């Protein structure tokens, strides 16, 4: 008898089905439509992701979305926490990706606590660049409070990565992305992070963020159990090609990629989680249940999240 088919879980969702979660005063109907669309793609649990912005704006967004979450049982069930990606990222071009340089700053525990309070204590994942001063202390404090710390949008040295791991960092966000188009041949951030078996790598299986052969190489290089899959989806996911927003950024979804017009860097993805499972199974040579585990139980276990069984119908 086959194992029960569980919901997928995505730890990095910036928007979906034409809805941009970065929008201030996001309408309740839009958020409900987005989570309904996610569930149609077999994804009943997500970490809703907010990206870099001014601290006051992030606090307002968290407080507003948390009010919507509390007021709607379907939203509350689907949005089981938040992922904060910025403003504690690298300000260097290339490493910051589409995140604005002007708002990046050293990790600040009091600022994080303000955002955590606004989010009702549900920020469960924070992505940061550990080269900022005070990063190790910050990681130690937030991980002791139950928040998972992930390294991303970073050009940290080996010693800075080592300090972050010893402080409690356990993930790396969209490994192979959030980096410049050109890197040194050997000593680069992808290799530095990949070399650390303590870190679980989050990978985006859309064929754009990582070509299939790169996805295979990264998957093979990590120890068993040290890879998770995510979409980094934004509002263009489960929506037609065209113009969309990612917060204050205007982007274009075309040919399976989302970019700022005139820029080479990616700005999230238009991948849906169920398509990500199909891609992973095909490109990594996995059985369906093995690919689903990377997008469900294995990821959810990092956050103590129990996934529901999908209705066979």
Q: Which residues are covered by each model-predicted region?
A:
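Divalent metal-dependent hydrolysis catalytic cores, especially in the metallo-beta-lactamase
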Residues: 13-20, 32-61, 77-90, 119-131, ...
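Short helix-capping segments at alpha-helix termini
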Residues: 70-77, 119-121, 144-146, 222-223, ...
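Di-metal (Zn2+ and/or Mg2+/Mn2+) metal-binding site signature of metallo-dependent hydrolases
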Residues: 3-24
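Metal-dependent catalytic neighborhoods of phosphoester/phosphodiester hydrolases
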Residues: 56-67, 95
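Residue-level marker for buried hydrophobic side chains located in beta-strands
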Residues: 7-9, 82, 150, 227-230
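Active-site-adjacent C-terminal substructures of enzyme catalytic domains
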Residues: 138, 160-292, 302-306
């Amino acid at each position: 008898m086959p194992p029960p088919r569980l919901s997928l879980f995505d730890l990095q969702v910036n928007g979906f089905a034409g809805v941009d979660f970065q929008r201030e005063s996001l309408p309740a109907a839009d958020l409900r439509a987005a989570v309904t669309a996610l569930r149609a793609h077999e994804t009943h649990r997500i970490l809703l992701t907010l990206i870099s912005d001014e601290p006051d704006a992030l606090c307002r967004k968290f407080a507003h979305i948390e009010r919507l979450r509390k007021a709607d049982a379907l939203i509350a069930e689907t949005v089981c926490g938040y992922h904060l990606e910025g403003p504690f990222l690298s300000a260097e071009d290339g490493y910051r990706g589409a995140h604005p340089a002007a708002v990046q700053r050293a990790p600040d525990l009091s600022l994080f606590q303000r955002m955590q309070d606004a989010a009702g204590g549900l920020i469960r994942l924070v992505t940061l660049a550990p080269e900022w001063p005070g990063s190790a202390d910050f990681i130690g404090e937030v991980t002791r409070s139950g928040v998972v710390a992930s390294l991303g949008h970073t050009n940290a040295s080996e010693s800075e990565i080592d300090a972050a791991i010893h402080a409690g960092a356990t993930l790396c966000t969209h490994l192979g992305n959030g980096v410049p188009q050109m890197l040194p041949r050997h000593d680069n951030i992808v290799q530095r992070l990949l070399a650390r078996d303590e870190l679980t790598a989050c990978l985006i299986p859309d064929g754009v963020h990582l070509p299939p052969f790169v996805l295979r190489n990264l998957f093979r290089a990590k120890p068993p159990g040290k890879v998770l899959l995510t979409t980094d989806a934004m509002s263009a996911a489960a929506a037609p090609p065209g113009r969309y927003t990612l917060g204050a950024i205007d982007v274009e979804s075309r040919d399976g990629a989302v970019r700022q017009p005139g820029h080479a860097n990616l700005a999230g993805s238009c991948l849906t989680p169920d398509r990500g499972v199909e891609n992973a199974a095909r490109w990594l040579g996995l059985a369906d249940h093995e690919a689903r585990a990377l997008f469900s139980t294995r990821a959810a276990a990092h956050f103590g999240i129990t996934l529901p069984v999908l209705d066979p119908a």
